[in-house]
């Protein structure tokens, strides 16, 4: 199996210049390939990866585009493969039509592949094609590296995301089952009666973020001080993102390791974000990313993920007798008593138990 491990790297000035040169060349080739495929489509021609790769070879022969020879050649080819994958995802209706890349995008990355051991970690350094040895902050040991994505973030930092082979550790509970009901106040409640609070990282950083953004708005446009302040704002956002990702990684790993079967609600998160009263809170808790982590980690450990339909009334149904109480549509009701069997329910715990029951029912159907 494969997974990505992200480490921070510290290139020197010359290496930074090369990284940005390669980023620019990859963006140029990607956009050139996209324009070629778009024009071909309009003229009824079928343009694929092989045609765009031949285009790259021809461009390198022209003196006007001699700068392409200085970049990482593997990275240029990978940008065309990424473009091809974008079209595959578009035609299979998994993504929208590929867009042109802008140099004004503050987040930039390129991918390069390990060939003949030209990517490896040696002590406190990582060897990368054409970059040589770059200082790396390595927090764990890695085996053979398949490929690397070099990232430059809006906060001005550089990272290497290593794709490596790994063997997942055995689960602590091979037969466990659990239902998960996500929320805003509590990040999720489970069918065992546990509740995990929403850490609200963005809300906790909002005062500092507003202060830094206010300072940014006062800086003169295109000035050096404005760029320094922009980086300060980006670092606040980056800290919130890192805190949230760490929380999601730990919660998803714990659930997958401790349970064989996980039942979740198949929420239309994009549709829910259209509600302007809840959009900020929903985006902040990152349910979609949490579900995505559960899915790919379940693939590692051989777990089963069952998605219960959105329209299933998990909160309104009594988990003891099955009575449906339409009065519970009111989101303000957190504790309720079943009129039929008189069981007292916590709204979220009851919903998670019903999600588990429905998911197991779908599994056996």
PLM feature segments, named:
Residues 1-365:
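Nucleic-acid substrate recognition interfaces
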């Amino acid at each position: 199996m494969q997974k990505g491990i992200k480490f921070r790297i510290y290139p020197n000035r010359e290496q930074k210049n090369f990284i940005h040169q390669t980023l620019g060349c990859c963006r140029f080739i990607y956009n050139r390939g996209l324009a070629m495929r778009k024009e071909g489509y309009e003229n009824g021609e079928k343009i694929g990866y092989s045609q765009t790769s031949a285009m790259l070879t021809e461009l390198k022969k022209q003196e006007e585009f001699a700068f392409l020879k200085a970049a990482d050649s593997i990275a240029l080819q990978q940008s065309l493969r990424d473009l091809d994958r974008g079209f595959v995802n578009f035609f299979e209706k998994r993504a929208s039509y590929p867009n042109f890349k802008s140099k004004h995008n503050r987040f930039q990355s390129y991918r390069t592949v390990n060939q003949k051991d030209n990517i490896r970690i040696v002590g406190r350094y990582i060897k990368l094609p054409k970059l040589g040895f770059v200082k790396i902050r390595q927090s764990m040991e890695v085996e053979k590296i398949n490929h690397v994505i070099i990232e430059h973030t809006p906060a001005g930092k550089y990272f290497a995301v290593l794709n490596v082979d790994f063997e997942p550790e055995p689960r602590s509970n091979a037969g466990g089952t659990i239902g998960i009901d996500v929320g805003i106040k509590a990040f999720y409640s489970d069918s065992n009666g546990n509740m995990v609070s929403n850490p609200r990282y963005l809300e906790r950083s909002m005062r500092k973020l507003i202060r830094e953004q206010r300072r940014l708005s006062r800086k003169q446009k295109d000035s050096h001080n404005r760029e320094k302040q922009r980086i300060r704002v980006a670092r606040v956002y980056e800290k919130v993102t890192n805190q949230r990702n760490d929380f999601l990684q730990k919660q998803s790993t714990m659930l997958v390791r401790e349970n064989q079967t996980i039942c979740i609600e198949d929420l239309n998160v994009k549709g829910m974000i259209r509600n302007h009263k809840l959009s900020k809170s929903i985006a902040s808790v990152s349910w979609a990313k949490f579900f995505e982590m559960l899915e790919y980690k379940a693939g590692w450990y051989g777990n089963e993920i069952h998605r219960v339909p959105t329209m299933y009334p998990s909160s309104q149904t009594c988990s003891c007798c099955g009575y449906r109480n339409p009065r519970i549509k009111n989101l303000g009701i957190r504790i309720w008593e079943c009129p039929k069997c008189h069981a007292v329910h916590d709204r979220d715990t009851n919903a998670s138990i019903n999600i588990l029951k429905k998911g197991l029912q779908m599994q056996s159907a």
